[in-house]
C-alpha cells in the first residue's frame, strides 16, 4: 500500500534519485560510523546510506513508516518524536561521535536544531535538508537581514555551510518553498558559555531588532548589574557572534 504523506508531520518525501546521490556523496558514510537519520520516511536516503555504512539508526515518528523500517535487520529504529530523543545518550551507547543526517520536517526544523545543540560535543557532523530560507538564516553574517537569534546560537557551536540547493520538484509532494542541504561541523573547543544565559541574552537583543540595544539589551544588563563594557549604541544585527559570546562569558559567575 502506498504511504500518503501526512501534513501534520510535515512530510515531503525526497524522490529525485540524482539529488539523493548528491546528498549521500556529500555525507560520504563509511562502515563502522555511528550514523543517525532523522525522519527516514520512505527510505530514499536510507537505502544508499545503509549500502555504504552497513548499519544505521533511524528516528521515525510515523507509526506506519516505523513498522516498515523494522523489517530491515540493518536498521535500529527509534519510534519517537525527535524532540524527545537524547542524542548525547545515543552517542554514549554508540561508543563514538554521531553523524546525524536527515530531511527534517520543515514545520519543526528550528526546534530540532536547538534540541541538538546540547549534544554538539558528541557529534562529528550534521547534514540536513531544510527550507533554504532557514539555511540562509543559520549561515547569515552580521549586518544582513537574515542574521538573528538562530544565526548566533548555531554559529556559537558549529561551522555552517550550505552545500546543495534542492528544487521543490525533487520531493513528493513538492513543498511550496526552495530547499537546501546544510553541513554543520561542531567546533572542537567553543567558548564555554551557559547556553540558557546566551539564549536569553540573544533573544532579548533581537526582540526589537531595529532598535538600538540600549532600549532592549541595555535594560536587561542593568537588571543584572553588569559593570563591564559593551556597546549598546548598535542594533542587534550589527553585533558579531564573538561579541555576544564575550558578553555571555562576562556575565557568567566566576568569569568576570
Swiss-Prot record:
Its Gene Ontology cellular component terms are:
cytosol
Question: For this UniProt entry, what is the primary localization, expressed as one broad class?
Answer: cytoplasm
One Pfam family this chain carries? RrnaAD
Q: What terms describe the molecular function in GO for this protein?
A: 16S rRNA (adenine(1518)-N(6)/adenine(1519)-N(6))-dimethyltransferase activity; RNA binding
Source species, please?
Methylibium petroleiphilum (strain ATCC BAA-1232 / LMG 22953 / PM1)
The record's subcellular location field reads: Cytoplasm
Amino-acid positions noted as binding S-adenosyl-L-methionine in the UniProt annotation, renumbered to this chain:
12, 14, 39, 60, 81, 103
Q: What is its EC number?
A: 2.1.1.182
| InterPro entries the record matches | KsgA/Erm, rRNA_Ade_diMease-like_C, rRNA_Ade_Mease_Trfase_CS, rRNA_Ade_methylase_Trfase_N, rRNA_adenine_dimethylase, SAM-dependent_MTases_sf
Superkingdom: Bacteria
Task: Explain the purpose of this protein.
Answer: Specifically dimethylates two adjacent adenosines (A1518 and A1519) in the loop of a conserved hairpin near the 3'-end of 16S rRNA in the 30S particle. May play a critical role in biogenesis of 30S subunits.
Q: Give the matching PANTHER family.
A: DIMETHYLADENOSINE TRANSFERASE, DIMETHYLADENOSINE TRANSFERASE-RELATED
Q: What is this protein called in UniProt?
A: Ribosomal RNA small subunit methyltransferase A
Amino acid at each position: 500500500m502506498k504511504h500518503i504523506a501526512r501534513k501534520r508531520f510535515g512530510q515531503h518525501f525526497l524522490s529525485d534519485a540524482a539529488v539523493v546521490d548528491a546528498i549521500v556523496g556529500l555525507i560520504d558514510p563509511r562502515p563502522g560510523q555511528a550514523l543517525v537519520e532523522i525522519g527516514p520516511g520512505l527510505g530514499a536516503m536510507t537505502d544508499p546510506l545503509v549500502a555504504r555504512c552497513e548499519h544505521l539508526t533511524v528516528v521515525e515518528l510515523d507509526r506506519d513508516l516505523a513498522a516498515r523500517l523494522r523489517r530491515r535487520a540493518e536498521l535500529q529504529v527509534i519510534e519517537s518524536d525527535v524532540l524527545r530523543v537524547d542524542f548525547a545518550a545515543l552517542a554514549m551507547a554508540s561508543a563514538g561521535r554521531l553523524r546525524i543526517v536527515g530531511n527534517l520536517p520543515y514545520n519543526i526544523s528550528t526546534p530540532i536544531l536547538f534540541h541538538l545543540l546540547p549534544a554538539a560535543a558528541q557529534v562529528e557532523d550534521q547534514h540536513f535538508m531544510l527550507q533554504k530560507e532557514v539555511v540562509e538564516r543559520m549561515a547569515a553574517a552580521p549586518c544582513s537581514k537574515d542574521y538573528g537569534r538562530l544565526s548566533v546560537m548555531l554559529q556559537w557551536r558549529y561551522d555552517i555551510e550550505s552545500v546543495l540547493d534542492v528544487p521543490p520538484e525533487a520531493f513528493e509532494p513538492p513543498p511550496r518553498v526552495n530547499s537546501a542541504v546544510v553541513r554543520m561541523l561542531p567546533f572542537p573547543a567553543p567558548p564555554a558559555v551557559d547556553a540558557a544565559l546566551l539564549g536569553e541574552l540573544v533573544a532579548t537583543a533581537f526582540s526589537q531588532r531595529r532598535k538600538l540595544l540600549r532600549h532592549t539589551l541595555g535594560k536587561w544588563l542593568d537588571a543584572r548589574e553588569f559593570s563591564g563594557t559593551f556597546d549598546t549604541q548598535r542594533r542587534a544585527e550589527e553585533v558579531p557572534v564573538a561579541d555576544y559570546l564575550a558578553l555571555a562569558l562576562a556575565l557568567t559567575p566566576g568569569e568576570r
